[in-house]
Amino acid sequence: MSVAGLKKQFHKASQLFSEKISGAEGTKLDEEFQEMERKIDVTNKAVAELLSKSTEYLQPNPAYRAKLGMLNTMSKIRGQVKTTGYPQTEGLLGDCMIRYGRELGDDSMFGLALLDAGESMKQMAEVKDSLDINVKQNFIDPLQLLQDKDLKEIGHHLKKLEGRRLDYDYKKKRLGKIPDEEVKQAVEKFEESKELAERSMFNFLENDVEQVSQLAVFVEAALDYHKQSTEILEDLQSKLQNRINVASSRPKREFKPKPVITTTLETGDNQQHNGIAYSSSIKSSGSSMHVDQPCCQALYDFEPENEGELGFKEGDIITLTNQIDENWYEGMLNGESGFFPHNYVEVMVPLPQ
């Protein structure tokens, strides 16, 4: 930094110290300027919080957001273009309904209803994905650009104005000790910065209809999401009502108990005692697997939907390596590692605390 630059920094620091400690008054700008500055400050805070809250609105689970951010960062490091989508709650609920609907089978009215509801929830998850993309592209991204460009530029002008104001006030109070030419230059630079800052704030506030348009797009996207969701749910309601009508009209079946003890030798596994055969209902279990490291056993099949997840089949023994959060584990199977939901497995040997 040049000697002139060092002197200017000293002047600013000295004036700021005088105002903060000694209570000296600096040059006051007009009320119209101060009001514009206040609105810019509020807009800055509003944009920052809107960005945060809008993301929470679309992706409410902080654990999933953290996991998603980690997976997408890993994808960028690896040079992969495809990113991992947020697991919508409707989709997770739909997967649960479909899984148990299939287990109950086609002869279960409740199972068939679960399949209907599960498919509808999956459709709603797809609609929610579309909402996410629409809001991000047409509301969040423009707000981010507003924060990074327009508001940042205004902030730069205001910061420069404050520095020149301090330099001007310092020299103004020392008239006679400082050459008139320096005071004149300080006045000119102060007025120049004020005009730049004032014009940038004025133009921004006059064109705030752009932000209104972006907000309108956000509301339109949310409305479209709710309309489509309503149509899906109304269709599901009709299907379920139809199943209720079918179930109510079908003939009732009578319960017929089956005897446990029979008098006929049915299989070689039956035990005979005093001429009566008893059907053995107990099967010998295989030898238990010896495990000496953290592991779990799969209760159901798990098909990975996102990159980084570990797929497995019912009955697989998975080595546990880490617990991501209360909902997700990390483990290894057949040399592959990845994440999987805790409610799909039963822990056999827990991870060390």
From Swiss-Prot:
Residues 218-254 are annotated as: Interaction with ARC. It is found in: Cytoplasm; Early endosome membrane. Residues 60-87 are annotated as: Required for dimerization upon membrane association. InterPro entries: AH/BAR_dom_sf (IPR027267), BAR_dom (IPR004148), Endophilin-A3_BAR (IPR032469), Endophilin_A_SH3 (IPR035824), Endophilin_SH3RF (IPR050384), SH3-like_dom_sf (IPR036028), SH3_domain (IPR001452). One of its GO terms (cellular component) is glutamatergic synapse. Residues 180-201 form a coiled coil. Gene3D superfamilies: Arfaptin homology (AH) domain/BAR domain, SH3 Domains. Pfam families: BAR, SH3_1. Residues 18-249 form the BAR domain. Disruption phenotype: Hens express reduced levels of SH3GL3 in ovarian follicles prior to uptake of yolk proteins. Residues 291-350 form the SH3 domain. Keywords: Coiled coil, Cytoplasm, Endocytosis, Endosome, Lipid-binding, Membrane, SH3 domain. GO terms for biological process: endocytosis. The keyword Disulfide bond does not apply. GO terms for molecular function: lipid binding. The keyword Ribonucleoprotein does not apply. It comes from the Eukaryota. Implicated in endocytosis. May recruit other proteins to membranes with high curvature. Implicated in endocytosis of yolk proteins during oogenesis. Belongs to the endophilin family. An N-terminal amphipathic helix, the BAR domain and a second amphipathic helix inserted into helix 1 of the BAR domain (N-BAR domain) induce membrane curvature and bind curved membranes. This is Endophilin-A3. It comes from Gallus gallus (Chicken). The lineage of its organism: Eukaryota, Metazoa, Chordata, Craniata, Vertebrata.
